């Protein structure tokens, strides 16, 4: 019996698919499709790891989220006691400058739009987390791609010009029975952003890229949140539900600074507050509700911006299941 298909078949999209070889606590190897641990949200993207009904807005505006690429990773744990560190070193497919734009900086540069990824200029990632104090984790990450223009869909689209990208991030979390606190900062630098902008505005209308420019030289995001476990106030009485009232502040701007001759859009500068509740019905099941207010065009923590503010109320339900057993 002979069968043939005239139209293209479907495909399966995976966030992670890799093979891991555990060699020693201090050195292990992973190869395949994996998370790129740049920033707090990508490294800890499950919804029980942030209080809001949606992922932190700043990081997910300027960085891919969830950021996953194909490559190889070396990881392990060094030291012991108060001098315990986890590390990750990755070489992955680099970001594609075709996806860089005004409103999301490099967030849309993640590869995967087509069936093949370009590995002409790989991305190099280093992440280190300090875990020596119980309940405390302090981390930092660095991403470097020597030429994001080299990963363009068309090899000569950027006429041989280079566009190096550097992303720096730092984050921390402190968690005990009473309180959970998190903070993070991301700063990015794109060289030759003015030239990238001049080319991206001329991308084909048939492409799915936004073509909205200019792409900024620098982007930034920083945030902090604190939640209090109400059950702890009642001596951890099991009859009291596990509810965390929380507050979160974020500032982000995908157009923090441009090159000479570039005009940045003030509307991309956002200062925002989020307040709400998280009810953990189960350790891995959380019901969320929050209220958000965004001030547009200002970096001030308090006060209003020159544009109309945005206010919204959200409710969410999240369940995390990594493994299942009878």
Label the predicted regions.
Residues 48-56, 106-109, 200-205:
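Short glycine/proline- and charge-enriched loop/turn segments
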Residues 17-21, 42-44, 139-326:
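Outer-membrane beta-barrel pore domains
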Residues 105-151:
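Loop-centered beta-sheet repeat module
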Residues 59-61, 112-115, 212:
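Active-site rim elements
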Residues 84-87, 98-104, 141, 151-153:
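A short secondary-structure junction signal
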Residues 65, 115-122, 160-164:
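Active-site glycine- and acidic-residue-rich loops that bind
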Residues 1-97, 120-125, 129-137, 218, ...:
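Outer membrane beta-barrel
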Residues 5, 48-49, 107-108, 114, ...:
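Short leucine-rich amphipathic alpha-helices used at interfaces
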